[in-house]
A protein has these predicted regions:
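Acidic carboxylate diad motif detector
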Residues: 1-73
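Generic, well-ordered alpha-helical scaffold segments in large soluble proteins
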Residues: 7, 11-14, 135-138, 177, ...
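Short acidic-glycine loop/turn motifs at beta-strand connectors
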Residues: 41, 75-76, 114-117, 242, ...
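Generic recognition of long tandem-repeat/solenoid scaffolds
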Residues: 43-48, 79-84, 256
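Short amphipathic beta-strand/extended segments with alternating polar/hydrophobic composition
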Residues: 48-66, 94-97, 118-124, 264-267
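Substrate-contacting helices/loops that form the catalytic groove of nucleic-acid
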Residues: 67-69, 75-213, 284-303
Length: 303
C-alpha cells in the first residue's frame, strides 16, 4: 500500500511539473515491489511471505551493500527482478574539468556535438514495423481472449521488447563513446513530452532522446564526467562565433550562415556550440540553467 501511494503521488507531481497526462490505472501483473527482509543465497532469492525463488543472476551484489527492496516485473520474455541496494557512503559528484562538449538533440539527426559529430536518427522501430503490422492484421481476425489471440499478442509484445532492448543498448554504447576523453558535457533542458505530442512524435519516441539523456547523465556520473543542462531557448538562432542573433530558421535550412561574421557551419553543430558556450558561462557564474536577461539581450554566446 505504501509503495502504491508513493507511485500515485509521484504520478500527480509529474502531471503538474512535467506536463504528463492524468495518472492511469496499471495492471497489477505488470510489476510490484516487495519490502522487508530480502536476501540472495546462491541462485535463490528469499523474500517475505514467499518461498525461495530461483533466478538467473546478471551480476554479483557489491560487498557492503544491503538489499532494501525488490521489484518484480513481468515482460513478454519472462519475469525480472530488480534489486534496490543501498550503501551509506558520500558520493563525490564530478566537478568541471577537461575538454567540454555541447550536445544538440534533434529529429533529422539524433544528436550533434560541438566537436562536429553528427549522428543520423536511428530507426529502431522502422526495422521491425513490417513484422509488427503483419501480426496486428492477423490479430484483428482472431477472437479476443482466444488462444490464437493471446499467442499473437505475445509475439507482438516480444517484438516491441526487442526494439526497446536494442534502443537501450545503443543509448548506453553511445553514452560511453561520448564520455571517452571528455571532462564536461552540456545538453539542453528539453521537455520531451511535448516532442512526443508534436508532428514528429513517432520519430521522437522511436529515438528515445529523453531516455538517452538520462542514461548519459548516469554514465557521466560513473566516468567522472561533469554533466549539466542549459537553457534551450534560441540555441539555433545565435551565431556561436560572434554572438549575433540571426533569427528563426526554417527546419529545411540545415546550414548556419552568419550575415555578420560569415561563419558557416552545420545547423545542429552550431547549436551544440552555443550549448557548450552556455554551459561554460554557467560554470563561470555558478548557475546550472542560463536564462534570458530582462534587457532582451540573448545569453549563451561568446562575444
Amino acid at each position: 500500500m505504501q509503495q502504491t501511494l508513493r507511485k500515485l503521488d509521484r504520478a500527480f507531481n509529474d502531471m503538474k511539473s512535467k506536463g504528463m497526462g492524468f495518472p492511469r490505472y496499471k495492471k497489477k501483473i505488470k510489476s510490484f515491489n516487495i519490502l522487508g527482509k530480502i536476501s540472495v543465497e546462491g541462485k535463490y532469492i528469499k523474500m517475505p511471505l514467499l518461498k525461495n525463488i530461483k533466478f538467473r543472476k546478471s551480476r554479483d551484489i557489491p560487498e557492503g551493500f544491503k538489499i532494501k527492496q525488490i521489484q518484480i516485473i513481468k515482460k513478454a520474455s519472462g519475469y525480472y527482478a530488480n534489486l534496490m541496494i543501498e550503501l551509506d557512503v558520500n558520493v563525490v559528484q564530478p566537478i568541471p574539468h577537461g575538454h567540454a562538449i555541447g550536445i544538440d538533440g534533434g529529429i533529422q539527426s539524433m544528436i550533434a556535438t560541438s566537436d562536429g559529430l553528427v549522428l543520423p536518427r536511428p530507426k529502431f522501430l522502422d526495422k521491425a514495423l513490417r513484422k509488427i503490422k503483419l501480426l496486428q492484421r492477423k490479430l484483428r481476425n482472431k477472437k479476443k481472449g482466444s488462444n490464437k489471440w493471446n499467442q499473437l499478442n505475445h509475439r507482438i509484445a516480444l517484438l516491441h521488447e526487442a526494439v526497446a532492448n536494442k534502443r537501450k543498448e545503443y543509448h548506453f554504447n553511445l553514452a560511453h563513446q561520448l564520455c571517452d576523453g571528455v571532462g564536461m558535457i552540456f545538453v539542453e533542458n528539453i521537455n520531451f513530452v511535448s516532442w512526443s505530442k508534436g508532428l514528429f512524435g513517432k520519430h521522437s519516441l522511436d529515438m528515445g532522446l529523453g531516455q538517452f539523456f538520462n542514461i548519459l547523465e548516469y554514465v557521466c556520473s560513473k566516468k567522472d564526467t561533469y554533466f549539466a543542462k542549459v537553457d534551450k531557448n534560441y540555441t539555433s538562432q545565435i551565431c556561436p562565433n560572434c554572438g549575433t542573433y540571426t533569427g528563426k530558421k526554417d527546419l529545411s535550412v540545415r546550414v548556419h550562415n552568419c550575415p555578420k561574421c560569415q561563419y558557416i557551419q552545420n545547423r545542429d553543430v552550431a547549436a551544440s556550440e552555443v550549448i557548450r558556450s552556455r554551459g561554460l558561462e554557467n560554470i563561470a557564474v555558478g548557475t546550472t540553467v542560463n536564462k534570458q536577461p530582462s534587457d532582451g539581450v540573448l545569453a549563451g554566446a561568446s562575444a
